[in-house]
Curated annotation (Swiss-Prot):
This is Putative uncharacterized protein C16C4.21. It comes from Schizosaccharomyces pombe (strain 972 / ATCC 24843).
Length: 81
């Protein structure tokens, strides 16, 4: 599974990303701002992204051909100091 920036109607380019899902794949890898690869489980998408300071506010699925695309809106937030 791969993570791509996406231009989704109603969301700016930097606010969302598309996960291209193969049903037989249970994990995907995302690179953080420092280029460090992070491996996520599909079943824990929301929890994992939140733990790494990504706050998914919506999750949509759309079918394109034989692929299912998971659209995740993400917002960065700063920890309280």
């Amino acid at each position: 599974m791969q993570l791509y920036p996406a231009n989704v109607k109603g969301l700016r380019y930097s606010e969302c990303c598309i996960l291209t899902a193969n049903p037989s794949v249970q994990h995907f890898v995302m690179h953080d701002d420092a280029g460090v690869p992070l491996t996520y489980s599909v079943s824990t998408l929301h929890a994992e992204l939140t733990d790494h300071l990504y706050l998914p506010t919506t999750r949509k699925t759309v079918a394109v051909g034989k692929k299912t695309l998971f659209v995740v809106q993400k917002k960065r937030f700063k920890p309280e100091t």
